[in-house]
Amino acid sequence: MNRAHRLVVALSISAGSLATGLLAAVPAASDTFPSRPITIVVPYSPGGPTDAAARVVGERMSAVLGQSVVIENVTGGGSTIATGRVVHAEPDGHTILIHQLAIAANVSLLKLPYDTEKGLTGIGLVNYSPMVLVGRKTLPADGMAEMTAWMKRTGPGVKFAHAGSGSLAHLCAALLAQSVGVTVNMIPYRGGTPALTDILAGHADIYCSSPATAIEQIKADMIKAFSVTARERMPALPDVPSAVALGYKDLDIQFWQALFAPAGTPAPVVDRLNQALRVALTDPKVLKSFADSGMSAFGADALAPATASAKLHDEIKRWAEVIHANKIEAAQ
């Protein structure tokens, strides 16, 4: 090796060593995260299930991450203002979103100023609950088979209550009517409570309710409960059968919630948030809070960030088909 060649090799080695040293001096994103308080953006007002989940989960995640977790309720625009804020936030993990099934339905219901799937990445699924199909006490049917047979006989005379155009209760009602092959009279209400009130009063026939809204009335035998929209029975309603087990395969319907970060958030940061979420979802206080509102935590096998992203993708596709087939429009 001549002198010039030896000099080039030596300089290359020195430059490589310097670069390695500089890279080693730069801490990985996961080593410095979080460097300030984390904001969980909630698209709904305080007091609802999404806000409640954000607060109890955020408190436990704060202890794991060693930084404060701030809950910020950003309402309006059918939850699009909050979602858009996180989509356009700095992708560093310090501003994240908690949302529920509506984030998937909104893709087909609204003209969005962002691309939901391209703008967000999953951190992890949080909790879920099936719906429960209930009816007025005087409905001449006991059990799903009799109820759906009555729907076929009655047709447009069926007064099917729901909690507002585009709500999960509406989507559930549309999917049931579609699977039974009948056209019914869909009656919108401003939320679940007034819908259930009219079921109790006998002014409406059937309603697809959240368990938390109807469980006390079911246990008091004030209304009929035909099935839960799940593969298995609910522990809180052990006497109410599973719609899927009864043969209604399409009626596997979950109200679910998940955490999302802006697209482009470094994988180590997403993983750090996911690890904190996993710890939170094993905390007895968190689990009790969920149970008190009729919710269950997702199991450990469903908690990977990719699973949350896949859930969003699948739900967007599923509800797009129902919304378009039934010409459902968002509430004005």
Give a label for each model feature.
Residues M1-S35, A145, A331-Q332:
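Short, low-complexity disordered leader/linker segments with a strong preference
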Residues A25-K118, G157-K159, S165, G181-I206, ...:
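N-terminal (or domain-start) structured segment
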Residues S35-P37, A267-Q332:
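An extracytoplasmic/periplasmic, membrane-proximal ligand-sensing/linker region
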Residues M61, H88-H94, V107-P194, A243-A245, ...:
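Hinge/capping helix and adjacent helix->loop/strand transition within the periplasmic-binding protein
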Residues Q100-L101, K137, P211-A212, A230, ...:
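Short secondary-structure boundary segments
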Residues D115-V126, A161, T183-I187, D205-I206, ...:
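Short beta-strand->loop
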